[in-house]
């Protein structure tokens, strides 16, 4: 089993996003992407991240928190998922 957090992590921007927007956070598979993290308001994605090789869930959540800070501060939308799906579809099949 993976090692538990040795220190408490805070995700202030995730907390603020959930409280202020009544949005949702999802972590999971979006085929063909094995691991992704999404923050959305209704059907409107605000942040979508692709899990990196060997990235832990806490590390992915930390990146989500940072990206949500940018969204909260300036409305910056981050989308790693759609470009990655397009890239994989365009790649030659083995």
Where do the PLM segments sit?
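Short, charged, intrinsically disordered terminal tails
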Residues: 7, 74-94
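N-terminal acidic leader/helix
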Residues: 4-35
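Short, flexible helical or helix-coil boundary motifs
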Residues: 21, 25, 68-71, 75, ...
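Amphipathic alpha-helical packing elements
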Residues: 35-79
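Short, well-ordered helical secondary-structure segments
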Residues: 5-8, 12-14, 42-44, 48-51, ...
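Compositionally biased, intrinsically disordered low-complexity segments
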Residues: 28-30, 50-52, 80, 88
């Amino acid at each position: 089993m993976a090692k538990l957090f040795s220190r408490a992590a805070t995700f202030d921007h995730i907390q603020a996003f959930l409280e202020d927007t009544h949005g949702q956070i999802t972590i999971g598979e979006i085929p063909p992407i094995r691991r992704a993290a999404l923050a959305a308001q209704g059907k409107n994605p605000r942040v979508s991240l692709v899990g990196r090789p060997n990235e832990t869930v806490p590390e992915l959540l930390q990146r989500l928190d940072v990206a949500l800070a940018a969204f909260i501060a300036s409305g910056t939308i981050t989308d790693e998922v759609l470009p990655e799906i397009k890239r994989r579809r365009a790649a030659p099949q083995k």
